[in-house]
Amino acid sequence: MLFRSSWKNQLYLTVTGRNDWDSKLAFSKQKSFFYPSVGLSALLSEMVKLPEVISYAKIRGSYTVVASSFDRFLTNPGYEYNSQTHNWANPTVYPMDNMKPEKTKSWEIGLNLKFWGNRFNLDATYYRSNTLNQTFKVDIPSSSGYKQAIVQAGNVQNQGIELALGFSDKWAGFGWSSNATFTLNRNKVKRLASGSVNPVTGEAIQMDEMNVGWLGKENVAPRVILTEGGSMTDI
């Protein structure tokens, strides 16, 4: 779904909506997922009188939700193949019927300015996004017939600024243009799975640290560890 509207060539509104049906959601209570976005921009240089030095001015803002599915077979796991023994074994992950897509909710605001007859231009943007419903595996009692269960939790936040400054002009048939950019991004693990509930035992989960792999050979290279309050690049 896409909707666009404008008012007097000064205000511009864009609204989108998308609904996906994913086969990975089979055997789950949620059969599809919807995610919208909305954006609004205003041409200040057309709405109000600005100083002569400013030839163009626009402000903009947007809010977006992007959804993505999880790995296959989490709602209906099949037999697992062991590449060492070349045998098939019963699934070890407890099947879940309430899986939800991972979602990233983001918003940004920006400003575009042009000066001195469009010779100089400035573009500034601030953004923030939060990624939710990440998939974690937690241990469960062997009496359940499985080794692990899936928990969806987590909150990883990204925020930053982007600045771009440009110059463009012509003299007697000779043109010159140059641009400079600056970006700054910071990410933070706001939450892992702590505070969630084990779907099998009903007990509260304590997970404020998670090992996600090695930067090379196992037990030799540095290890990447996620901790609540840390960043995605902590080692």
Feature names for model-found ranges:
Residues 17-21, 63-65, 182-184:
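Acidic helix/loop microenvironments that form the catalytic cleft of cell-wall polysaccharide enzymes
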Residues 3-27, 31-46, 104-107, 115-122, ...:
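Surface-exposed extracellular loop regions of Gram-negative outer-membrane beta-barrel proteins
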Residues 1, 73-95, 136, 141-149, ...:
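Surface-exposed loop/turn segments flanking beta-strands in extracellular/periplasmic regions
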Residues 1-12, 58, 62-63, 75, ...:
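Outer-membrane beta-barrel transmembrane domain signature of Gram-negative proteins
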Residues 1, 76, 80-123, 149-171, ...:
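Outer-membrane beta-barrel signature, preferentially recognizing the C-terminal barrel domain
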